[in-house]
């Protein structure tokens, strides 16, 4: 439910014209893995990954944590098209920008 609600809110913010950047870590990073299985949530009848894809179609930047791939069985080729691997330096630079808001789930 946490991942689904995060994606619902991300899509709502993007629909209102805001720029959205998503950093997926730990179990949430599996949202970015092709072929991963997720529960379907009502009332939309969709999965968190479905909403992540929609968020990406709205222009969101989506990245997995730098430590996700080296510490799992996954490789970059397993990620959804358009998902990147975050580099700590650029993420820190982005976090320091005035006006950047954080929502953590």
Stretches found by the model and what they are:
Residues 10, 49-53, 91-92:
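Short amphipathic alpha-helical segments and helix-helix/interface helices
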Residues 39-68:
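A glycine-rich helix N-cap at a beta->alpha junction
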Residues 16-21, 58-61, 98-100:
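Loop/turn elements at helix/coil->beta-strand transitions in domains of secreted/extracellular proteins
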Residues 20-26, 63-66:
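Short internal beta-strands
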